Amino acid sequence: MQFERISTEQKKLSLIQTFLHQNALKLDEQIEYFVVGYNDNEQIVVCGGLAGNIIKCVAIDESLRGSGVALQLITELVDLAYTLKRPHLFIYTKPEYATLFKSCGFYIISDANPYVVLLENSATRLQKQCSLWEKMRVDGNRIGSIVMNANPFTLGHRYLIEQALQQCDHLHLFIVGEDASQFSYTERFEMIQQGIFDLSNITLHSGSDYIISRATFPNYFLKDQLITDESYFEIDLKLFRLHIAQALGITHRFVGTELNCPVTAEYNRQMHYWLMDAEMNAPKINVIEIPRKTASNHIISASTVRKHLAEKNWAQLAEFVPMTTLNYLQKCGRF
């Protein structure tokens, strides 16, 4: 079979989209490259895409299923990823297709049955990462954690961190690693690093592929947005409780209350269930919701900060972010 690598800027994208629709899939807009395979009539019969380090939109013509062409396709996609220096790969798929990808060298690391399973191309990488986290473990009765995007870092983020530190012996701070925000991962990490420089008893972790970003979670094979969101919540929170929290000895997770975004509010509710109530082979984690900090009678949020930044409302911006963020934005030419 002849394979071809296609960037999403090429005209052939419409043919790929048609083929995906024929296989009950939608085109995922985050895909940067496709690998497609043609039959003797130069018709697309297999395809798969690469978005960052996630393989997406794998489709195989019904006539070729079970023929071994899936292994050829995945091999081509893995070769492409290695060429792009992306050796650590993930696949989200329906549970009924997990066996297919396991035969291609992928291993299940989390699931949201009966809708989604998450696989990666290593049998030991997650275990090795947990071993690294175990070396960062800090003794204490109350070990806290926060996961944040910080797009950008605001006084609200700083307040949440301060409140958490008052309630625990040590705090682990995780940053969502994907570059799917207005500010890049590097920018967000540096703003947080500068914004907490004066605080002690805190470990700032670099971005991890095992902190799942909602922005990169696929929805191309799930028809219902509610099911997509709930599957994301489950996969992300189970990874956190079963692996990250166990390795670091985390006992508490802190989060700001959410009044404006229904999806984030539901994530907070699901957090109580998956971290505290659900029965699984891992200690329960106490979820603590901290009321959001306000400025001028308005809740401080990163979205409001981005709005002030876009509208060049410098005075209002200064009320919502610490001086370290202001200095960083100015240094980077954001205002």
From Swiss-Prot:
Domain of life: Bacteria
Xref: NCBIfam families: cit_ly_ligase, cyt_tran_rel
Lineage: Bacteria, Pseudomonadati, Pseudomonadota, Gammaproteobacteria, Pasteurellales
Protein's UniProt name: [Citrate [pro-3S]-lyase] ligase
Entries under InterPro entries matching the protein: Acyl_CoA_acyltransferase (IPR016181), Citrate_lyase_ligase (IPR005216), Citrate_lyase_ligase_C (IPR013166), Cyt_trans-like (IPR004821), GNAT_dom (IPR000182), Rossmann-like_a/b/a_fold (IPR014729)
UniProt keyword annotations, A-Z: ATP-binding, Ligase, Nucleotide-binding
Xref: SUPFAM superfamilies: Acyl-CoA N-acyltransferases (Nat) (SSF55729), Nucleotidylyl transferase (SSF52374)
EC assignment: 6.2.1.22
Gene Ontology biological process terms, A to Z: biosynthetic process
Enzyme class: ligase
